[in-house]
């Protein structure tokens, strides 16, 4: 019984500690570029890191290393901060991420954000064949040319700048497209680049007009696209209601943990009482048995003397 009791005590203590400990995780922050992730050379880039209310520190990381730190000043409790990157150049272009801290607890790292610097090289020219006005169901090819030798060309549709098509060539690259539908309508620009993060000036826009009644969405581009309006910083201040809800949620969690811990302690006390009663009954039985044995021996001794 004693070994079982010790095992139950250890289990109860472990459970009570796990119940009493708060969940040691924070939501992953969201990193965004304000206005656009394509920033002209020598202009300022602004990145937003959106975390949780009550965060005391935000860190911006560039290519895995610490780049900048921002600490929100009370009493303005907001759910994120803005990092300003002045004088954009090729050394500051690359992959960014952010984390934040509440008390001594750090969040997970955000997803990666690619920040691109533009206007690094000459301006390419963009054309489309067979022409800028086609019928739905036809195939078209965009041609991007940059007389300054490069290694990669990029084609973007205005309003969907995250849907980047890449093609490789020294002076010119082709971007075949189609069969086109009305979903392909819009203005396109191209860039030249030596890497993923330093691009040339944008070409003049070429507007593709698609006529016809075919509205087969299965022929539209399958890559995920994001409107440019997605690139915006949605930072909000904490309202009184949000504070009250957060306080109530924290209080409810503490009460739940305390209640569960109390139940565990009650169960342990019951086990201790049961063990004590069991030991007491065992001792009483042993005492009665010893007394009875003594009397039996005494009576036997008297009988032998007679």
From Swiss-Prot:
SUPFAM superfamilies: Immunoglobulin. Expressed in NK cells. Disulfide bonds join 49-98, 144-190. Pfam families: Ig_2. Residues 42-100, 137-192 form the Ig-like domain. Residues 1-21 form the signal peptide. It is found in: Cell membrane. Cytotoxicity-activating receptor that may contribute to the increased efficiency of activated natural killer (NK) cells to mediate tumor cell lysis. This is Natural cytotoxicity triggering receptor 1. The gene is NCR1.
């Amino acid at each position: 019984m004693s070994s079982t009791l010790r095992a139950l005590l250890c289990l109860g203590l472990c459970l009570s500690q796990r119940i009493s400990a708060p969940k040691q995780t924070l939501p992953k922050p969201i990193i965004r570029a304000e206005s656009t992730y394509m920033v002209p050379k020598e202009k300022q880039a602004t990145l937003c890191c959106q975390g949780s209310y009550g965060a005391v520190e935000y860190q911006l990381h560039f290519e895995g290393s610490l780049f900048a730190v921002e600490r929100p000043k009370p009493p303005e409790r907001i759910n994120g901060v803005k990092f300003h990157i002045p004088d954009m150049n090729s050394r500051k272009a690359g992959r960014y991420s952010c984390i934040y801290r509440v008390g001594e607890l750090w969040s997970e790292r955000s997803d990666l954000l690619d920040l691109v610097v533009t206007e690094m090289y000459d301006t390419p020219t963009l054309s489309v064949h067979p022409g800028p006005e086609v019928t739905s169901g036809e195939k078209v090819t965009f041609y991007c040319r940059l007389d300054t030798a490069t290694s990669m060309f990029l084609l973007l549709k205005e309003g969907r700048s995250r849907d980047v098509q890449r093609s490789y060539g020294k002076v010119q690259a082709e971007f075949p497209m189609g069969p086109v539908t009305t979903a392909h309508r819009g203005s396109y620009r191209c860039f030249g680049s030596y890497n993923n993060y330093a691009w040339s000036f944008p070409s003049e826009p070429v507007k593709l007009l698609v006529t016809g009644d075919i509205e087969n969405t299965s022929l539209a581009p399958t890559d995920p696209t994001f409107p440019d309006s997605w690139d915006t910083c949605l930072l909000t201040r904490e309202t009184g209601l949000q504070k009250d809800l957060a306080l109530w949620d924290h209080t409810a969690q503490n009460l739940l943990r305390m209640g569960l811990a109390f139940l565990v302690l009650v169960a342990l006390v019951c086990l201790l009482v049961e063990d004590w009663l069991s030991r007491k009954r065992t001792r009483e039985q042993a005492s009665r048995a010893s007394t009875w044995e003594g009397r039996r021996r005494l009576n036997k001794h008297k009988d032998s003397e007679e």
